[in-house]
């Protein structure tokens, strides 16, 4: 049965934390964290909403902060000057949080301001902190975190959907932060800092804020990244996200279709040194991502196309043919050694889908049926409209908003 921690439990927890810090030191870690946010144990002690204790660990703000203070002090004692001790701390909470509780978070930070070696600042709201680009602008947490450096001399790390080097540099130069916390951007491009340092901004695979990386936590699936298709493959021997084996023949390759898959195949084959022809039926390249970027809030998705085009345009061994629809005979007549079919797919208009695995057979005659492809092409229906969403992901809501 759940119960409140007694004094013995707290002593045991502190012992576990000290031993963990010592193991990190012995393993040559540079930083050891005291994690006081995101609903973990220390968050429960800090909040008056969850800490109902009547002993020295409950009641006043000072008492509710006692365990956090003890862990910081004991961790510093254990690691000595071998490791820095950082505190992950929230300066804001859920949308319904009272102003009094928000003020208390700030008062506590001032009270502990000089105790750790580094402050890693966030807000206690995953929805906003890890917000998708559809709803949250880049650097959207600045208003919550801009005060932190005014109350401590210690280095400060902040987060908040950073993607652009310009935004990152701006916050550092304006004294908002000392370090940028960039988890999703480093998933999209592990070499982001080096590319900024080297001035290779056009080579950065900027995060698009779609959060496909984070969805795996809830679905129990391996991590993925729309911008970085090699993400999650670190287990492979000699794996490197940007180093690909050179070509092993003089074969020529035809890639049919310049959507995301076709562009990535062309980029990778071109990097390997193969002669590549990329044929696209339309004038505009990018396929579905170009169209989806026109939907409300998805403009940043166009980076999937832009990054790959920028890389392809540098390659003298790649030819791009726009407005070049190919039949099967056309493909064979090219005489290439290999063909990559990357023509993608279109949305069906007969109701066939995941939960309805057969076409509708009872639609009224004359019913104006449109697909997401039609909506993205500018065919907006007039009058009352029913949206049948068998995808249950993002498209149904976006089509509704677009209409």
Regions found by a protein language model. Name each.
Residues 1-256, 260, 264-276, 284, ...:
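Flavin-dependent oxidoreductase catalytic cores
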Residues 58, 133-136, 293-298, 356-357:
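Short glycine-enriched, charge-decorated loop/helix-capping segments at active-site entrances
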Residues 109, 145, 193, 308-309, ...:
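Short amphipathic alpha-helical segments and helix-helix/interface helices
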Residues 247-279, 285, 320-335, 343-357, ...:
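Rossmann-like dinucleotide/flavin-binding elements
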Residues 287-336:
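N-terminal Rossmann-like dinucleotide/flavin-binding domain of flavoprotein oxidoreductases
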Residues 340:
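N-terminal Rossmann-like NAD(P) cofactor-binding module of classical short-chain dehydrogenase/reductase
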């Amino acid at each position: 049965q759940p119960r409140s921690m007694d004094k013995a439990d707290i002593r045991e927890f502190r012992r576990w934390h000290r031993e963990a810090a010592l193991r990190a030191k012995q393993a040559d870690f540079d930083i050891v964290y005291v994690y006081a946010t995101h609903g973990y144990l220390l968050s429960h002690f800090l909040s008056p909403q969850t800490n109902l204790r009547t002993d020295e660990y409950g009641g006043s703000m000072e008492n509710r902060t006692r365990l956090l203070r003890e862990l910081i002090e004991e961790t510093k004692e254990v690691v000595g000057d071998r490791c820095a001790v950082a505190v992950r701390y929230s300066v804001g909470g859920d949308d319904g949080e009272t102003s009094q509780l928000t003020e208390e978070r700030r008062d506590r930070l001032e009270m502990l301001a000089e105790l750790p070696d580094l402050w890693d600042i966030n807000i206690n709201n995953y929805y906003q902190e890890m917000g998708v680009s559809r709803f949250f602008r880049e650097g959207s947490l600045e208003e919550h975190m801009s005060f932190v450096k005014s109350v401590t001399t210690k280095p400060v790390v902040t987060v908040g959907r950073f993607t652009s080097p310009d935004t990152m540099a701006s916050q550092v130069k304006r004294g908002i932060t000392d370090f940028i916390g960039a988890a999703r951007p480093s998933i999209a491009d592990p070499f982001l800092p080096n590319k900024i340092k080297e001035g290779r901004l056009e080579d950065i695979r900027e995060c698009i804020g779609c959060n496909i990386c984070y969805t795996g936590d809830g679905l129990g699936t391996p991590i993925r990244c729309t911008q970085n298709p090699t993400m999650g493959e670190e287990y492979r021997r000699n794996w490197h996200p940007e180093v690909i084996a050179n070509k092993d023949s003089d074969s020529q390759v035809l890639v049919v279709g310049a959507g995301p898959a076709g562009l990535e195949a062309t980029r990778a084959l071109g990097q390997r040194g193969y002669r590549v022809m990329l044929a696209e039926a339309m004038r505009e390249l990018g396929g579905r991502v170009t169209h989806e970027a026109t939907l409300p809030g998805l403009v940043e998705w166009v980076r999937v196309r832009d990054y790959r085009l920028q890389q392809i345009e540098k390659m003298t061994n790649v030819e791009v043919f726009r407005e070049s629809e190919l039949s099967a005979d056309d493909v064979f007549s090219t005489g290439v050694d290999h063909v990559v079919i990357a023509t993608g797919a279109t949305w069906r208009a007969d109701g066939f889908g995941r939960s309805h695995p057969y076409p509708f057979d009872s639609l009224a005659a004359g019913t104006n049926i449109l697909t997401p492809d039609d909506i993205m092409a500018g065919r907006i229906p007039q009058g009352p409209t029913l949206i049948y969403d068998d995808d249950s992901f993002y498209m149904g809501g976006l089509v509704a908003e677009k209409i």
